[in-house]
């Protein structure tokens, strides 16, 4: 997605060989026009999948998930990382290791909002080692719902998360795939098209 790649190049900051800071438009401050375009792109890519619900994780996945849900006409449920006084019982639970924060979080979804009749699109901001996506998949599977695919805003293709998910037969659609963050420079995976002769 060209507009997203341009935003990453212009406003993203490489903090190390494996950390990209995008708090200017995605993780802290949110660019609603960009989020709207991201939502439209996810909806376009998954429009034939009969999505009934979008599942994401708090907090950075919420904006792109809501925009995609608006386009698809479905609801969003986000996995919580912290216990809530209003959500104590009747929860699906999974443990997720955060690459960025270097900690394990227990995530949960209420059983009241997802069931075996749902066809779910999982959306998240980043895909690195795949732990958040695997945790969200576990919650969806516990509910007996089916997974239509996973939409990722930014995939770090140099880490193994995307490979692990795809090897499990999961459809993963990433809007920007980063090949490298070496030397403080963002390099995108080049989508090569085969020429028919």
UniProtKB/Swiss-Prot annotation:
Keywords associated with the record: Cytoplasm, Glycosyltransferase, Purine salvage, Transferase
GO MF annotation: an example: xanthine phosphoribosyltransferase activity
Q: Which GO terms describe its cellular component?
A: cytoplasm
**Gene3D superfamilies per the record?**
3.40.50.2020
- Location relative to the cell: Cytoplasm
Name the reaction it catalyses: XMP + diphosphate = xanthine + 5-phospho-alpha-D-ribose 1-diphosphate
Tell me which Pfam families the record gives: Pribosyltran
Choose any GO biological process term that the UniProt entry carries and state it: xanthine metabolic process
Q: What class of enzyme is it?
A: transferase
InterPro entries the UniProt entry points to: PRibTrfase_dom, PRTase-like, Pur/Pyrimidine_PRTase, Xanthine_PRibTrfase
Q: What is its EC number?
A: 2.4.2.22
- The positions annotated for binding 5-phospho-alpha-D-ribose 1-diphosphate are 128-132
Pathway connected to this protein? Purine metabolism; XMP biosynthesis via salvage pathway; XMP from xanthine: step 1/1
The domain of life for this entry's organism is Bacteria
Give the binding site residues for xanthine: 20, 27, 156
Q: How does it assemble?
A: Homodimer.
Q: Which family does the similarity line name?
A: Belongs to the purine/pyrimidine phosphoribosyltransferase family. Xpt subfamily.
Query: Which HAMAP family does the entry link to?
Result: XPRTase
What is the annotated role of this protein in its UniProt record? Answer: Converts the preformed base xanthine, a product of nucleic acid breakdown, to xanthosine 5'-monophosphate (XMP), so it can be reused for RNA or DNA synthesis.
Name of the protein: Xanthine phosphoribosyltransferase
Gene symbol of the encoding locus: xpt
